[in-house]
């Protein structure tokens, strides 16, 4: 492992914190603070993502070694690593929250692979930093498993995301109050190694504008363009304008992907928005079970539902507006910023329409297809239909319906038998109209099935499935975590031997903590 090459441009090229103390404080005029991971008692590898390890240059023998667990548990460093925590702020639930920063995430370094790709390796749960505020800098096994699995699940679904290399248990208890209701309890501790080209967020830019530090703001903007958007050229004004436009475009495509797979992030604060258009910071996330566009998995958001499924594209645009506000002082004319925001809306509308058409098997979408799609979502919500299983069942619809009813064709997608029976005729009428319309565009049922199954996953990481793996791992059995890691690598392929993992949410999980609603406790 000592042959790995690190080139830590973030700390080499951006101003750092001159104060070496690892004490909670306001950090001014700096993009980062040097900080060492805090060692743990007994680092032990629980799981590793083999394709991420191979991408980074780690062999199976290396990932199985005690040295690997020590490094990625926070007890050792490799040559060339130069750990840091980043300074950023953010808008949380619509309100400016001031300095936030990496309170328990410590970046080890920027690894450059033999292919020339640059990957930042970041430990989450590696101990306190100057940005930890009142927290301990640690993470529990429960939330670490969720982040580890979801990072990889999203990648294999084709959704832009940070990756996860490893999950290491620490041997140390971490006290958390799961529901913030005054009942703290010790839980097993863990450290996840997250991997991305960059972990820079919208909030990294916001903090400097809020502090009127335009010098550091300009340095960060120009550094980000040079390192992470090297294809953008022109003079400084043109580069900055093109960069913001591309950030808007990437964010629009990210939102379309979330809507496609039924993913709800849960905490779309500006400090959780990647400048690269990646899904970042997996906390109280969830996938839709029954189709409910007003659903959010986050207990903190249960009343206002700011970050509900249907609202995510609008929130992303609001967050881009906050980013535009942050970088506006660098523009003599803010017209390019408004153009970028407009571009977000244009890109999202076109891509979202194409995505919806593809989910329903259409090659193109006109007024008739529009009406069918709108009616389908209304029925799915009214009848309490499982989002993921509905689209897979639709893809499996036979070439000829004959006299088959929607209940027969759709099968086990219903959560409420009474609602199913009440609306059976309406569902069948819709199904027949859809079958005629899609048949005009894709007359061959096998071709249609292949196309629909390519965009509608068979497997998504449902909260209740993840929670079962968490419960087992907490009791000392990591086999379910490792099984899920294998299954999620082929989310569009039917894996009959693992059919239990794609069952619609069981009734016992409807209101169970960790299965339906989650807090930010981690």
Swiss-Prot record:
Mg(2+) binds at residues 272, 281. Keywords: ATP-binding, Magnesium, Manganese, Metal-binding, Nucleotide-binding, Nucleotidyltransferase, Transferase. Disulfide bonds: none annotated. The active site is at residue 271. Its cofactor is Mg(2+); Mn(2+). It is an enzyme of class 2 (transferase). Transmembrane segments: none annotated. ATP binds at residues 101, 103-104, 124, 136-137, 194, 201, 281. Its EC number is 2.7.7.-, 2.7.7.108. It catalyses: L-seryl-[protein] + ATP = 3-O-(5'-adenylyl)-L-seryl-[protein] + diphosphate; L-threonyl-[protein] + ATP = 3-O-(5'-adenylyl)-L-threonyl-[protein] + diphosphate; L-tyrosyl-[protein] + ATP = O-(5'-adenylyl)-L-tyrosyl-[protein] + diphosphate; L-histidyl-[protein] + UTP = N(tele)-(5'-uridylyl)-L-histidyl-[protein] + diphosphate. GO terms for molecular function: AMPylase activity; ATP binding; magnesium ion binding. PANTHER family: PROTEIN ADENYLYLTRANSFERASE SELO, MITOCHONDRIAL. Belongs to the SELO family. Nucleotidyltransferase involved in the post-translational modification of proteins. It can catalyze the addition of adenosine monophosphate (AMP) or uridine monophosphate (UMP) to a protein, resulting in modifications known as AMPylation and UMPylation. This is Protein nucleotidyltransferase YdiU. It comes from Gemmatimonas aurantiaca (strain DSM 14586 / JCM 11422 / NBRC 100505 / T-27). The lineage of its organism: Bacteria, Pseudomonadati, Gemmatimonadota, Gemmatimonadia, Gemmatimonadales.
């Amino acid at each position: 492992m000592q042959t790995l090459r690190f080139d830590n441009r973030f700390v080499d090229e951006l101003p750092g914190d001159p104060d070496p103390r690892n004490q909670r404080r306001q950090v001014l005029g700096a993009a980062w603070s040097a900080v060492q991971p805090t060692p743990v008692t007994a680092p032990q590898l629980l799981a590793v993502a083999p394709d991420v390890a191979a991408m980074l240059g780690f062999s199976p023998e290396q990932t199985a070694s005690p040295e690997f667990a020590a490094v990625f548990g926070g007890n050792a460093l490799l040559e060339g690593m130069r750990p840091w925590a980043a300074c950023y702020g953010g808008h949380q639930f619509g309100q400016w929250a001031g300095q936030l920063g990496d309170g328990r995430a410590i970046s080890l370094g920027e690894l450059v692979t033999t292919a020339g790709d640059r990957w930042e390796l970041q430990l989450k749960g590696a101990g306190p930093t100057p940005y930890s505020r009142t927290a301990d800098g640690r993470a529990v096994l429960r939330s670490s498993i969720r982040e580890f699995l979801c990072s990889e699940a999203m990648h294999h679904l084709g959704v832009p995301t940070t990756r996860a290399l490893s999950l290491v248990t620490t041997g140390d208890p971490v006290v958390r109050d799961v529901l913030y209701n005054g009942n703290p309890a010790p839980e097993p501790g863990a450290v996840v190694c997250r991997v991305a080209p960059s972990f820079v967020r919208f909030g990294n830019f916001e903090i400097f504008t809020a502090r009127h530090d335009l010098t550091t703001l300009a340095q960060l903007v120009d550094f980000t363009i040079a390192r992470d958007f090297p294809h953008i050229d022109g003079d400084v004004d043109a580069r900055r304008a093109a960069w913001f436009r591309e950030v808007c475009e990437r964010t629009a495509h990210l939102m379309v992907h979330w809507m496609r797979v039924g993913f709800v992030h849960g905490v779309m604060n500006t400090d959780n928005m990647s400048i690269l258009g990646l899904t970042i910071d997996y906390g109280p996330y969830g996938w839709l079970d029954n189709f409910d566009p007003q659903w959010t998995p986050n207990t903190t958001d249960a009343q206002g539902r700011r970050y509900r499924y249907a609202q995510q594209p609008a929130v992303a645009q609001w967050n881009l507006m906050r980013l535009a506000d942050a970088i506006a002082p660098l523009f003599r004319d803010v017209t390019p910023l408004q153009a970028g925001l407009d571009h977000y809306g244009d890109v999202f509308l076109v891509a979202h329409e194409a995505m919806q058409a593809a989910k329903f098997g259409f090659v193109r979408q006109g007024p008739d297809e529009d009406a069918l799609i709108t009616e389908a979502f209304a029925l799915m919500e009214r009848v309490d239909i499982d989002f993921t299983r509905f689209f897979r069942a639709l893809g499996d619809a036979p070439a000829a319906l004959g006299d088959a009813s929607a209940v027969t064709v759709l099968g086990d997608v219903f959560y409420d038998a009474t609602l199913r029976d009440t609306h059976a005729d309406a569902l069948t009428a819709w199904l027949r109209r859809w079958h005629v319309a899609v048949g005009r565009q894709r007359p061959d049922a096998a071709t249609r099935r292949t196309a629909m199954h390519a965009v509608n996953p068979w497997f998504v990481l449902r909260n209740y499935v993840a929670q079962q793996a968490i419960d087992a791992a907490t009791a000392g059995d990591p086999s379910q975590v490792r099984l899920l890691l294998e299954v999620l690598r082929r989310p569009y392929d039917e894996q009959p031997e693992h059919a239990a993992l794609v069952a619609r949410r069981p009734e016992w999980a409807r209101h169970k903590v960790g299965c339906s609603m989650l807090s930010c406790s981690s």
